């Protein structure tokens, strides 16, 4: 296969390498492992294990294969890994499959580099885990490793539209993309008309396009130009419909293009300096697939991650993503580590050190539970982190008819300040626990939330702790009330003195989204994005500037009126 592929790549590169308007090269298309597990792949996996475990006894011990007579006494007797009942082995095979993607893309990039000019880039359209649309971190690729061979990261982001449009997927998947090279990225595919339920309302295509750029993308490219007439993507509609005629989507794309001809030089290469980050980990994602939550299935890891990322998004707190392979988190005031199910001790010690030296850590149930091979740590949970978190647990279950209530008055105060309820009698921060619950005993930690249930009322559902020069917030469960989660986060961030967002009681909240950054001219841009059909008026807080689209002067304190699905961009 590689031999034939190389012939094709070289012929193509010879054909286009001198064409002046070829600006870069996309290596492949949404390349993933796709469950590859043929005889050759399995033989390569055994070679990979031999390299990592020269002594087969060490391999058997690390993966617990003596249990249930799974022991492998000779590498030549290694069984078909598909269908194994040993989740550690299954997870290691997933890791190996991801490494094949990294090697394959790097192999292609090496060939392309023999031909490309210095002014041309190499990219790849990474996609994301999927339900009916892009939802979060990709399980079949280690995108941080795979992107090393590229000069710019690329992404395909698809999301709900019309009544279901929130912009959250544009942000979370865009933030993953921006984090891969710690730089701007390219949207190589996103929806025009898209799937039948996605047909955008007037104004939404433009709002989506500006949202991508506000997040740090340097492009918006649509899949695809015209709708196709046969086969599986016949109803994945492009800019043009099947009749090739102008339509509402096409005309709105023309508006976007004409605006960017005028102001694009002000928008490109937007840089951000966020003060909070969310950690991503492929091994934990796999772990949550092998040992799932109650209802989320294979999407459990991204469900927990999105619980936090979407809360930050609604609160207009911009955030970065970082890889779990990093060990220096000192550039961030606060670090969110969701569902770190699989973690080497080096990472847990780095998190402990981060807090001890003044960082503020937010983490969740099942973090620090198992090592890098999904072997459960045999001591107090959470392993290593129990001291910095100031708590421990030894039992957990799926919550049924278990309510969550605040313990601390500052959580209720944060909710009352930030969320307007015309009928105060209906205002409640009670919520239902879901997916997983740990029975937390606080040692030095202080309960923030508790379980309202006669069997569990003595246990904390969430707790905070002071440790060294920093602090921690731990969630032992999930719950369904967004306002409760946002209130807990706001209260904690207030206490830490967080400077990376507006935490005031009158701070704008979703559906009004605000994004900021520094452009190529060193000027600050402030994007106002209205994710609602209803018009809204927002007060501009910041230096005096110019609204770029309308060329209107803006003074601090001015009201900016946005129509339904409207956009404004102020340069200061």
Q: Where do the model's predicted regions map?
A:
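Polysaccharide-binding and catalytic clefts of secreted carbohydrate-active enzymes
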Residues: 1-163, 167-170
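Carbohydrate-binding surfaces of carbohydrate-active enzymes
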Residues: 75-78, 106, 118, 147, ...
């Amino acid at each position: 296969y590689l031999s034939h592929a190389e012939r094709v790549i070289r012929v193509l590169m010879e054909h286009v390498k001198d064409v002046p308007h070829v600006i870069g090269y996309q290596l492949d298309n949404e390349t993933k492992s796709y469950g590859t597990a043929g005889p050759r792949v399995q033989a390569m996996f055994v070679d990979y294990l031999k390299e990592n475990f020269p002594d087969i006894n060490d391999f058997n011990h690390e993966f617990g294969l003596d249990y249930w007579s799974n022991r492998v006494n000779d590498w030549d007797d290694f069984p078909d890994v598909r269908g194994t009942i040993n989740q550690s082995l299954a997870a290691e095979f997933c890791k190996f499959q991801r490494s094949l993607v990294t090697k394959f893309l790097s192999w292609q990039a090496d060939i392309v580099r023999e031909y490309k000019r210095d002014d041309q880039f190499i990219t790849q359209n990474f996609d994301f885990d999927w339900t009916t649309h892009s939802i979060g971190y990709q399980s079949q690729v280690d995108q941080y490793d795979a992107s090393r061979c590229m000069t710019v990261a690329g992404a395909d982001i698809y999301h709900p539209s019309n009544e279901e449009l929130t912009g959250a997927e544009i942000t979370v998947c865009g933030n993953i993309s921006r984090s891969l090279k710690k730089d701007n990225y390219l949207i190589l595919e996103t929806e025009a008309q898209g799937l039948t339920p996605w047909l955008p309302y007037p104004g939404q295509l433009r709002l989506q396009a500006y949202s991508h750029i506000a997040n740090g993308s340097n492009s918006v490219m649509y899949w695809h130009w015209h709708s196709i007439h046969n086969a599986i993507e016949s109803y994945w509609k492009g800019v043009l419909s099947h009749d090739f005629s102008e339509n509402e989507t096409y005309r709105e794309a023309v508006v976007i293009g004409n605006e960017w001809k005028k102001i694009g030089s002000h928008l490109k290469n937007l840089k951000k300096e966020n003060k909070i980050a969310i950690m991503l980990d492929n091994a934990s994602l796999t772990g949550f697939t092998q040992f799932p939550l109650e209802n989320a299935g294979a999407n459990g890891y991204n469900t927990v991650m999105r619980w936090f990322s979407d809360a930050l998004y609604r609160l207009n707190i911009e955030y970065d993503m970082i890889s779990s392979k990093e060990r220096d988190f000192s550039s961030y005031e606060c670090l969110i580590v969701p569902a770190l199910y699989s973690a080497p001790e080096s990472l847990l010690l780095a998190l402990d050190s981060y807090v001890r030296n003044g960082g503020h850590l937010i983490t969740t149930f099942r973090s620090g539970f198992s090592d890098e091979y999904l072997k459960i740590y045999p001591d107090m949970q959470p392993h290593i982190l129990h001291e910095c978190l100031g708590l421990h647990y030894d039992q957990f279950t799926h919550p049924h008819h278990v309510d969550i209530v605040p313990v601390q008055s500052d959580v209720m105060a944060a909710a009352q300040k930030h969320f307007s309820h015309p009928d105060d009698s209906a205002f409640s921060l009670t919520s239902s626990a879901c997916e997983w619950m740990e029975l937390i005993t606080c040692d030095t930690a202080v309960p923030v939330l508790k379980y309202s249930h006669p069997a569990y009322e003595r246990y904390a559902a969430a707790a905070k702790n002071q440790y060294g020069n920093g602090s921690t917030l731990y969630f032992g469960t999930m719950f369904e009330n967004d306002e409760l989660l946002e209130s807990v986060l706001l209260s904690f961030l207030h206490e830490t003195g967080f400077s990376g967002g507006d935490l005031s009681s009158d701070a704008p909240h979703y559906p009004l989204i605000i994004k900021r950054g520094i452009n190529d001219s060193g000027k600050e841009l402030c994007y106002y994005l209205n994710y609602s059909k209803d018009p809204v008026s927002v007060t501009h807080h910041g230096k005096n500037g110019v609204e770029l689209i309308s060329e209107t002067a803006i003074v601090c304190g001015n009201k900016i009126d946005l129509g339904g699905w409207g956009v404004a961009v102020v340069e200061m």
